[in-house]
């Protein structure tokens, strides 16, 4: 009876969080960056907070207290009669700077939203199930530029000064369900199905001002809605050639199969008073493909230390060779245009975790886990053929909720930069961001850590 009641309470709590998490993913801006103007926006860093605080490593991670979102083979690590639940929140501060016509301009924006909800549980001996709901990509931007009045121009001399505004917001969410099976001692395989859905709205407004001449010019508004729904799969393996009481060495690899995204795009153009006269409206499908991804990693852990290294490759460029866009930055004489195209990406990650004394009864701080990491790679789009380098430095810590407990409260920070290598040459913004995240990990099970959620009482 106690086991049944505990499971019911836990599932009710998860069900209560699920619609709130979905609402958060579809109702507010999760990113604020001009780099999200194209495609499906900025890709989010996958993984629960302990993984992201270590630079995002995790392909080879096997841990009783961490839901692994990078490799379904890790689901087999969940012990019998246990349940692992995770929930995370994340706040972001974006700072964008740009030099236009010799003048430095900057903007800043803050966001705060849900990041992930996940759980892991055993299905049978050496067989585990994992579920996660996480943001895959985010769109959020507001930008404008001007075409200045030029009396010598035969066209613009009659129109006057024109202001162009671009706005967009939305996101793509990933739902993942998978199984991990320890086929034989120290070797596990996993498979997962991933479903992507979301909606992205983009608005373009042209407003003539200071009109001269005999012409009569009015504003025009373009509204584009991208509706996304797609399925793809993932397979993974993990092997621990060293597995003793004192140290564990695990090698892991995962492959994302990829799949057609092909968002349904509904376009509307209005002229005159806003939303008054529809000039054109149609619905098409944008040819776009989610990339295949190959990732591999090594993870080494002892009683105090854990060190991981990951590498991930995504073939965005090979999958989306026909997807090209154009963009504009600056205003007036300083206005520049560029071509945007997808490119293949490589990302390197390294992370470390240190726990001074996990079972120390005298010092609370010695039971904390301290984490740090680094990530370096490239943006998945090029601008006039130039690739944008991006890197991040991460740190965080995990606080056990009580002595010998696996359940914890996790805190993490991340500082990153993007576009500094080519921003001045191409005319783009130099972007810095700072992220602050809080995660909650709940472990329930009949373990020797005092968390006896699934133990049958002697007298019922």
Features from the language model and the residues they span:
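N-terminal, post-signal peptide beta-strand-biased segments of exported outer-membrane/organellar beta-barrel
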Residues: 22-126, 131-135
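Residue-level detector of alpha-helical transmembrane segments in integral membrane proteins
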Residues: 12-13, 65, 284
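Generic low-complexity, intrinsically disordered sequence content enriched
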Residues: 11-15, 21, 58, 235, ...
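Outer-membrane beta-barrel porins/channels
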Residues: 25-46, 51-52, 122-460
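Bacterial Sec-dependent N-terminal signal peptides
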Residues: 1-28
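Short hydrophobic "helix-edge" motifs at membrane interfaces and signal-peptide entry regions
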Residues: 10, 60-62, 174-175
């Amino acid at each position: 009876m106690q086991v049944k009641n505990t499971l019911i309470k836990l599932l009710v709590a998860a069900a209560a969080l699920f619609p709130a998490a979905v609402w958060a993913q579809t109702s507010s801006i999760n990113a604020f960056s001009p780099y999200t103007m194209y495609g499906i926006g900025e890709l989010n860093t996958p993984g629960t907070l302990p993984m992201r605080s270590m630079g995002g490593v995790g392909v080879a991670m096997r841990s009783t207290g961490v839901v692994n979102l990078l490799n379904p083979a890790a689901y087999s690590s969940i012990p019998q009669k246990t349940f692992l639940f995770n929930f995370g929140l994340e706040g972001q501060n974006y700072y964008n700077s740009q030099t236009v016509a010799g003048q430095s301009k900057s903007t800043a924006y803050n966001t705060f939203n849900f990041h992930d909800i996940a759980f892991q549980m055993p299905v049978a001996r050496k067989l585990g199930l994992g579920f996660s709901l996480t943001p895959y990509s985010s769109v959020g931007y507001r930008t404008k530029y001007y075409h200045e009045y030029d009396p010598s121009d035969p066209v613009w001399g009659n129109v006057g000064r024109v202001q162009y505004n671009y706005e967009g917001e939305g996101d793509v969410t990933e739902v993942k369900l998978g199984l991990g099976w320890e086929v034989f001692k120290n070797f596990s395989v996993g498979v997962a199905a991933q479903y992507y859905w979301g909606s992205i709205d983009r608005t373009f407004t042209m407003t003539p001002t200071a009109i001269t001449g005999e012409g009569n010019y009015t504003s025009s508004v373009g509204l584009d809605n991208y509706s996304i729904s797609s399925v793809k799969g993932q397979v993974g393996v993990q092997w621990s050639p060293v597995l003793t009481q004192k140290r564990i060495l695990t090698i892991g690899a995962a492959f994302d199969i990829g799949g057609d995204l092909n968002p349904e795009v509904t376009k509307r153009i209005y002229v005159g008073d806003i939303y008054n006269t529809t000039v054109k409206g149609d619905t098409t499908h944008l040819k776009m493909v989610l990339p295949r991804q190959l990732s591999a990693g090594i993870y080494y852990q002892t009683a105090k230390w854990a060190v991981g290294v990951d590498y991930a490759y995504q073939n965005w460029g090979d999958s989306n060779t026909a997807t090209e866009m154009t963009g504009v930055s600056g205003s007036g004489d300083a206005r520049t245009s560029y071509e945007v195209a997808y490119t293949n990406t490589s990302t390197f990650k390294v992370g470390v975790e240190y726990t001074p004394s996990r079972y120390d009864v005298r010092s609370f701080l010695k039971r904390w886990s301290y984490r740090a990491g680094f990530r370096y790679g490239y943006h998945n789009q090029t601008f006039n053929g130039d690739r944008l380098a991006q890197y991040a430095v991460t740190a965080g810590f995990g606080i056990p909720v009580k002595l010998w407990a696996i359940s914890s409260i996790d805190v993490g920070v991340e500082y990153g930069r993007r576009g500094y290598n080519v921003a001045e040459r191409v005319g783009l913004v130099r972007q810095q961001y700072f992220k602050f995240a809080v995660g909650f990990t709940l472990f329930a099970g009949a373990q020797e850590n005092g968390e006896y959620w699934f133990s049958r009482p002697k007298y019922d």
